[in-house]
Amino acid sequence: MNKILFYLFVYAVVKSAAYDPLKAPNYFEEFVHRFNKNYSSEVEKLRRFKIFQHNLNEIINKNQNDSAKYEINKFSDLSKDETIAKYTGLSLPTQTQNFCKVILLDQPPGKGPLEFDWRRLNKVTSVKNQGMCGACWAFATLGSLESQFAIKHNELINLSEQQMIDCDFVDAGCNGGLLHTAFEAIIKMGGVQLESDYPYEADNNNCRMNSNKFLVQVKDCYRYIIVYEEKLKDLLPLVGPIPMAIDAADIVNYKQGIIKYCFDSGLNHAVLLVGYGVENNIPYWTFKNTWGTDWGEDGFFRVQQNINACGMRNELASTAVIY
C-alpha cells in the first residue's frame, strides 16, 4: 500500500471514530500528515506521541460512555493543560470596573417553547478562530454584540476582537480577561470598530482604535445570578445570545452530539449561548465556540441541560445593551 492510500485508509478510520488503541502509531502518523505537524526532534515527536496516545484512550472511553462523539483533532498532541493555556483565555483581571448591574434570577422558569435558536433567525455571525491567543473573552462578548446589532438592524457584522485585545486596559489581551470587564471596557472606550477596519492579529499590540469608526456602542451591561438553569430559556430570547464561562477541558476532542459528562475543575473559557432544544428526549444548550469551523459541529457544541455542564452556572452570565 503506497503512502497516499495508507493515509486515506487511516483517515477513513479516524473519521468513523471507531478507534482501535493498538493502531495509535498509525493514527498518529496520519495526524502528523493531516495537520502538518513539525517537531523539533525525535525526542519531542515521541513525547507528543505519548500525549496523543493518552488523548486517544480518553476519546475511546468517552465514545463508549457519552451520547456525544469525540475524535482525533488538531489538539490531539497537546495535553489538556497546554490546550487550556494556549486556546482559551478566561482569567481574572488585576483590576475591575463596577459598571454592570447584577440581577438575581431566582424566579421559577416560565413555560417557553421546547426549542429556540438565534441561528435560525440569522442573528448569529460566523464562527471565528482565536488561534493561540487567550482572547476567548473578547470573542464571546463581541459575538453577543454582533447578534444584538443583527437583531436591531437586520444586518450581520464582524466587530474587532483585536481592538479589545489592544485597547481594553482592564483585561490582559491574549493573556486573558473576563466577560463583564470586557463590556465595561467598551463603555469606557466609547465603542467598537469593525474587524475590517481593525483586523485580527492574534497577538498583543499597541492600541490603534479610531473613535470615528466606532459602529457599536454599549449603553448598559448586566450580570445574572442564575438560580435555575432553565431560566436561561426565558432570558435568551429576550437579550440575545449570552456570553458564558465554562471549563473547556472536557470538550477539547468533541466532534458532535450532546455532551452528558462535562466536569468543572475551574472555569477557563468563554463561549456564547445561542440556542436550546431537545434531541432523543435529551434537552440541550447550544454554544458557539471560537476554535474554527473544523472543530465540533461546524464550530458549535451542545451540552445537556440542568446538569451544570462544564460549570456553566458557576460564573455570572453577562450581557450588554447597545445604542
UniProtKB/Swiss-Prot annotation:
One of its GO terms (biological process) is proteolysis. Disulfide bonds join 133-174, 167-207, 262-310. Glycans are attached at residue 158. Synthesized as an inactive proenzyme and activated by proteolytic removal of the inhibitory propeptide. The keyword Hydrolase applies. The active site is at residues 136, 269, 289. InterPro entries: Papain-like_cys_pep_sf, Pept_asp_AS, Pept_cys_AS, Pept_his_AS, Peptidase_C1A, Peptidase_C1A_C, Peptidase_C1A_papain-like, Prot_inhib_I29. The keyword Hydrolase applies. Residues 1-16 form the signal peptide. Keywords: Disulfide bond, Glycoprotein, Hydrolase, Protease, Signal, Thiol protease, Zymogen. Belongs to the peptidase C1 family. PANTHER family: CYSTEINE PROTEASE FAMILY C1-RELATED. This is Viral cathepsin. The lineage of its organism: Viruses, Viruses incertae sedis, Naldaviricetes, Lefavirales, Baculoviridae. The gene is VCATH.
